[in-house]
């Protein structure tokens, strides 16, 4: 299995964010926090990919 690409990770981050907002509104704070952490992790991975691409282009 190949590593996820930027587009996949951005879609995952967006999905996790949207779900967390719905969970916050519904009073499901613990689940919302978990989804926000998933979002942060996905965005961090996007940052790593972008950083690697920048180094490859030097």
Regions found by a protein language model. Give the residues of each.
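Short, charge/polar-rich alpha-helical segments
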Residues: 1-7
């Amino acid at each position: 299995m190949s590593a996820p690409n930027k587009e996949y990770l951005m879609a995952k981050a967006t999905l996790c964010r949207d779900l967390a907002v719905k969970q916050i509104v519904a009073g499901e704070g613990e689940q919302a926090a978990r989804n926000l952490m998933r979002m942060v992790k996905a965005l961090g991975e996007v940052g790593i990919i972008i950083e690697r691409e920048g180094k490859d282009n030097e």
